[in-house]
């Protein structure tokens, strides 16, 4: 039978007897509160042997509810029993005959990953207080990006000066101006300036543009060959630069060439704009009547309509081909039209705009043809009134 240790103190026994449901003083020693007090007083005391002020009393299982709460260790309990708990660790100083609420784990049990609720180290060596000192021990060459939480965490007032100062931002890459070098006064305006010989030159001889971002890693590197650069610059000068005498020699020829090419270019542009048979036939021959207005004829067989503007002919050709490039973008409409003015007229049906007003009565209309039809009604009324007046005068004369 298991044995439990009960404290002999008379004051504690009297305290427990007053709070037990049983009025018998003999049963007070076996009450659940007595067992709980004895167990709690035994926790944490070193020593394998029980002190002399403890008495070995038998445990009565007839108490009922305590038997379901406490499972004391016994010496005769088999080690392979599934309900048996492992023996306590020798370092705790407990024997199997003593009751313990918290079972002791073996030496091979893994430690918990979280620290205990009541740590044994003082506050000076806690992880919270060691954080500023560990950050101060970081080398100065370490970039702030390696410790992202150190730069943003709130520190105690006394540890703000332990952080290393942030490194200064890197200077922006120095870019040279991408503009042509100023030409000297003695060179003519049509000559190409000399290429810069400095290290910031772009490497293209005769370009006159400086290199872009000398410190940029992606800038192209050209071989610094002075002989090749000089030879290329000389060849470029001989091919492109015209001196004053050369320019005066070719100036008349250039002017004559420009004058002869101008009418040809205008004729070619005119032929490209209109593809009607009339324009194609008159493209190479001079016009018979210079003052006559150009007419554009539809080339579709059987049509032969004539228009005074190319845009009108193009709109007419869309009617033949069925092309409708002008689409209404109103919600749930999507109608397409051949001409843009048809689309604008259709949009007024959505917006309700009436831009055409009658000068006689002020009535407004969406379309101009509706207004013209309405104006005719006013004219007809005037004619009727005039006719009625003439008839009256004729009747008076009779």
Swiss-Prot record:
<dbReference type="GO" id="GO:0000978">
    <property type="term" value="F:RNA polymerase II cis-regulatory region sequence-specific DNA binding"/>
</dbReference>
<keyword id="KW-0539">Nucleus</keyword>
<keyword id="KW-0010">Activator</keyword>
<feature type="zinc finger region" description="C2H2-type 3">
    <location>
        <begin position="356"/>
        <end position="378"/>
    </location>
</feature>
<dbReference type="GO" id="GO:0001227">
    <property type="term" value="F:DNA-binding transcription repressor activity, RNA polymerase II-specific"/>
</dbReference>
<keyword id="KW-0677">Repeat</keyword>
<feature type="compositionally biased region" description="Pro residues">
    <location>
        <begin position="163"/>
        <end position="174"/>
    </location>
</feature>
<feature type="zinc finger region" description="C2H2-type 2">
    <location>
        <begin position="326"/>
        <end position="350"/>
    </location>
</feature>
<feature type="short sequence motif" description="9aaTAD">
    <location>
        <begin position="187"/>
        <end position="195"/>
    </location>
</feature>
<feature type="zinc finger region" description="C2H2-type 1">
    <location>
        <begin position="296"/>
        <end position="320"/>
    </location>
</feature>
<dbReference type="InterPro" id="IPR013087">
    <property type="entry name" value="Znf_C2H2_type"/>
</dbReference>
<dbReference type="GO" id="GO:0036342">
    <property type="term" value="P:post-anal tail morphogenesis"/>
</dbReference>
<comment type="function">
    <text>Binds to GC boxes promoters elements. Probable transcriptional activator that has a role in the coordination of changes in transcription required to generate pattern in the developing embryo.</text>
</comment>
<dbReference type="GO" id="GO:0000785">
    <property type="term" value="C:chromatin"/>
</dbReference>
<comment type="similarity">
    <text>Belongs to the Sp1 C2H2-type zinc-finger protein family.</text>
</comment>
<dbReference type="GO" id="GO:0005634">
    <property type="term" value="C:nucleus"/>
</dbReference>
<keyword id="KW-0862">Zinc</keyword>
<keyword id="KW-0804">Transcription</keyword>
<dbReference type="InterPro" id="IPR036236">
    <property type="entry name" value="Znf_C2H2_sf"/>
</dbReference>
<dbReference type="GO" id="GO:0060349">
    <property type="term" value="P:bone morphogenesis"/>
</dbReference>
<keyword id="KW-0863">Zinc-finger</keyword>
<feature type="region of interest" description="Disordered">
    <location>
        <begin position="160"/>
        <end position="204"/>
    </location>
</feature>
<keyword id="KW-0805">Transcription regulation</keyword>
<keyword id="KW-0238">DNA-binding</keyword>
<protein>
    <recommendedName>
        <fullName>Transcription factor Sp5</fullName>
    </recommendedName>
</protein>
<dbReference type="GO" id="GO:0006357">
    <property type="term" value="P:regulation of transcription by RNA polymerase II"/>
</dbReference>
<dbReference type="GO" id="GO:0008270">
    <property type="term" value="F:zinc ion binding"/>
</dbReference>
<dbReference type="Pfam" id="PF00096">
    <property type="entry name" value="zf-C2H2"/>
</dbReference>
<keyword id="KW-0479">Metal-binding</keyword>
<dbReference type="GO" id="GO:0000981">
    <property type="term" value="F:DNA-binding transcription factor activity, RNA polymerase II-specific"/>
</dbReference>
């Amino acid at each position: 039978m298991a044995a439990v240790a009960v404290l002999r103190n008379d004051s504690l026994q009297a305290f427990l007897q007053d709070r037990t449901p049983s009025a018998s003083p003999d049963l007070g020693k076996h009450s659940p509160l007595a067992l709980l007090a004895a167990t709690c007083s035994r926790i944490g005391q070193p020593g394998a042997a029980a002190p002399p002020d403890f008495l070995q009393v038998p445990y009565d299982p007839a108490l009922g509810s305590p038997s379901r709460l406490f499972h004391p260790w016994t010496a005769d309990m088999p080690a392979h029993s599934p309900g048996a708990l492992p023996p306590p660790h020798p370092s705790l100083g407990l024997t199997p005959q003593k009751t313990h609420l918290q079972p002791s784990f073996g030496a091979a049990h893994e430690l918990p990953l979280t620290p205990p609720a009541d740590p044994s180290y003082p506050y000076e060596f806690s992880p919270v207080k060691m954080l500023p000192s560990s950050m101060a021990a970081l080398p100065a060459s370490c970039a702030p990006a390696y410790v992202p939480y150190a730069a943003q965490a709130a520190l105690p007032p006394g540890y703000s000066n332990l952080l290393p100062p942030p490194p200064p931002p890197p200077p922006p890459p120095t870019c040279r101006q991408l503009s042509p070098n100023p030409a000297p006064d003695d060179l003519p305006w049509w000559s190409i300036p000399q290429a810069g010989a400095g290290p910031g030159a772009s490497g293209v001889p005769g370009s006159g543009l400086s290199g872009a971002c000398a410190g940029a890693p992606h800038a192209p590197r050209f071989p610094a060959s002075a002989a090749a650069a000089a030879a290329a610059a000389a060849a470029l000068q001989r091919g492109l630069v015209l001196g004053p005498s050369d320019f005066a020699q070719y100036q008349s020829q250039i002017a004559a060439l420009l004058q002869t090419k101008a009418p040809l270019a205008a004729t070619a542009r005119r032929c490209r704009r209109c593809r009607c048979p009339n324009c194609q036939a008159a493209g190479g021959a001079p016009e018979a009547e210079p003052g006559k207005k150009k007419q554009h004829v539809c080339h579709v067989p059987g049509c032969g309509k004539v228009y005074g503007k190319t845009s009108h002919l193009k709109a007419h050709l869309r009617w033949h081909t069925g092309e409708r490039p002008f689409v209404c973008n109103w919600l749930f409409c999507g109608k397409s039209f051949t001409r843009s003015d048809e689309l604008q007229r259709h949009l007024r049906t959505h917006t309700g705009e009436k831009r055409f007003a009658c000068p006689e009565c002020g009535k407004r209309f969406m379309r101009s043809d509706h207004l013209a039809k309405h104006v005719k009604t006013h004219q007809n009324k005037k004619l009727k009134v005039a006719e009625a007046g003439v008839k009256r005068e004729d009747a008076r004369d009779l």
